[in-house]
């Protein structure tokens, strides 16, 4: 009797955890690209090591990007980006925590393309700002989801100072693209 009760208690504890684990999607190789265009110079950087977790049942979503993982065409650009602008030793990550908001009545578990809004807090360079951006989520038949989002980011909004010497080479607003392929964890 005691063994049966112990088994039942264990099963009741583990069953919700198994169900929750089945609902969790994630990746460790998402991609964030940013682009700066000025008459003086175009700058592109890519980070292909973005970690993200998405819970379709609640809409909760999180991203974490190591700043030093952004790669530039020129090594000198990468060095200045990490040391002078982003201070990546002091602020090693950019983090987003928020929620996916499907359009009214849309079911993200249904295969197809879904227009959504993503709302939450973006923390970068020690500054947190609340943002809301449109995004697209494409659900595959196997339950995987491709998520894409384009947004604009102003470095000054996050306390990132651009020295006057290079100000003409860096746009006031950066174009940021997020591309994530979520799979079941």
For the regions a protein language model found, what residue spans apply to each?
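Bacterial Sec-dependent N-terminal signal peptides
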Residues: 1-24
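Low-complexity, acidic/polar, glycine-enriched regions of mature
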Residues: 22-185
């Amino acid at each position: 009797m005691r063994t049966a009760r112990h088994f039942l208690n264990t099963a009741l504890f583990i069953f919700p955890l198994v169900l929750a684990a089945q609902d969790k999607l994630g990746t460790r190789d998402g991609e964030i690209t940013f682009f700066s265009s000025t008459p003086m110079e175009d700058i592109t950087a890519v980070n292909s090591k973005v970690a993200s977790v998405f819970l379709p049942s609640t809409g909760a979503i999180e991203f974490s990007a190591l700043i030093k993982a952004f790669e530039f065409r020129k090594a000198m650009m990468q060095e200045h980006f990490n040391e002078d602008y982003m201070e990546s030793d002091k602020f090693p990550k950019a983090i987003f925590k928020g929620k996916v908001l499907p359009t009214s009545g849309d079911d993200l578990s249904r295969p197809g393309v879904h227009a959504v809004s993503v709302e939450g807090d973006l923390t970068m360079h020690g500054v947190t700002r609340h943002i809301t951006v449109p995004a697209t989520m494409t659900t595959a038949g196997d339950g995987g989801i491709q998520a894409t989002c384009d947004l604009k980011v102003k470095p000054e909004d996050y306390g990132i100072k651009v020295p006057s010497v290079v100000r003409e080479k860096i746009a006031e607003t950066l174009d940021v693209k997020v591309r994530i392929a979520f799979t079941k964890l």
